């Protein structure tokens, strides 16, 4: 983990040096550097994120079939698992595919927490309405929760069934928790989180459109 921490510190320093050569005012250069770092990290994770989103979208689409299987084999767990895996294979779905990007993002987030705690230059630096990137900002915290909520909303299954309601409640709970956590973190880290959520929303909308086009071509 220390190698990742040190690598991200060096990476951020390089990006900030490049940005500050164009934008000399530190009240803009640090914030823009954080956004650039987020874009680069998201770009690196893009193939995994798209694959993950496709799996999630397809699983949501076949929920009626999954529920039929669950109802039919509710007293036979082994057969239930076999039939579900058969269905996933038929639709080319990896049920665990959505977990990998999330598992990769947490070490990065923890490493960035280390980065912003060890880069002294951000102390006292403002960005947009944020007075100090090294201090918490309540507006950013609310934005973190709101973007987290809408990002999750785009991926949640539609309908009034139990799974849709559970996913909706979990999304709301996580978003409220995000506001609480972000209100205690340095604004620099929360800018990364908000920017990442906005990018995620764009990726989800684009991937959904591509999946709809793929389904339409398949049915034609």
From Swiss-Prot:
Question: What is an example of a GO molecular function annotated in this UniProt entry?
Answer: membrane insertase activity
Q: InterPro entries given for it?
A: YidC/ALB3/OXA1/COX18, YidC/Oxa/ALB_C, YidC_ALB_C
Give the record's GO biological process terms.
protein insertion into membrane; protein transport
Fetch the Pfam families from UniProt.
60KD_IMP
Q: How does it sit in the membrane?
A: Multi-pass membrane protein
Which cellular components does GO assign to this protein? plasma membrane
What keywords is this UniProt entry annotated with? Answer: Cell membrane, Chaperone, Membrane, Protein transport, Transmembrane, Transmembrane helix, Transport
Q: What subcellular locations does the record give? A: Cell membrane
Where is the chain membrane-spanning?
A: 4-24, 30-50, 96-116, 172-194
Role noted for this protein: Required for the insertion and/or proper folding and/or complex formation of integral membrane proteins into the membrane. Involved in integration of membrane proteins that insert both dependently and independently of the Sec translocase complex, as well as at least some lipoproteins. Aids folding of multispanning membrane proteins.
Quaternary structure annotation from Swiss-Prot or TrEMBL:
Interacts with the Sec translocase complex via SecD. Specifically interacts with transmembrane segments of nascent integral membrane proteins during membrane integration.
Family label? Belongs to the OXA1/ALB3/YidC family. Type 1 subfamily.
Q: What is this protein called?
A: Membrane protein insertase YidC
Q: What is the lineage of its organism?
A: Bacteria, Bacillati, Bacillota, Clostridia, Eubacteriales
């Amino acid at each position: 983990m220390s190698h990742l921490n040190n690598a991200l510190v060096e990476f951020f320093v390089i990006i900030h040096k490049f940005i500050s050569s164009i934008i000399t005012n530190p009240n803009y250069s640090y914030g823009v550097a954080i956004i650039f770092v987020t874009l680069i990290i998201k770009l690196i994770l893009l193939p995994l994120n798209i694959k993950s989103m496709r799996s999630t979208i397809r699983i949501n689409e076949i929920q009626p079939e999954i529920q039929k299987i669950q109802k039919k084999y509710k007293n036979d767990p082994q057969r239930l698992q076999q039939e579900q895996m058969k269905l996933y294979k038929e639709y080319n779905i990896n049920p665990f595919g959505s977990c990998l990007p999330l598992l990769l993002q947490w070490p990065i987030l923890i490493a960035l927490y280390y980065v912003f705690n060890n880069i002294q230059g951000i102390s006292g630096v403002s960005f947009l309405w944020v007075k100090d990137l090294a201090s918490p900002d309540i507006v950013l915290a609310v934005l973190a929760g709101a973007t987290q909520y809408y990002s999750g909303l785009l991926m949640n299954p539609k309908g009034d069934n139990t799974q849709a309601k559970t996913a909706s409640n979990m999304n709301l709970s996580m978003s409220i928790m995000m506001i609480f956590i972000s209100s205690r973190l340095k604004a620099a880290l929360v800018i990364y989180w908000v920017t990442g959520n906005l990018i995620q929303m764009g990726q989800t909308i684009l991937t959904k459109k591509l999946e709809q086009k793929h389904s339409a071509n398949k049915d034609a």
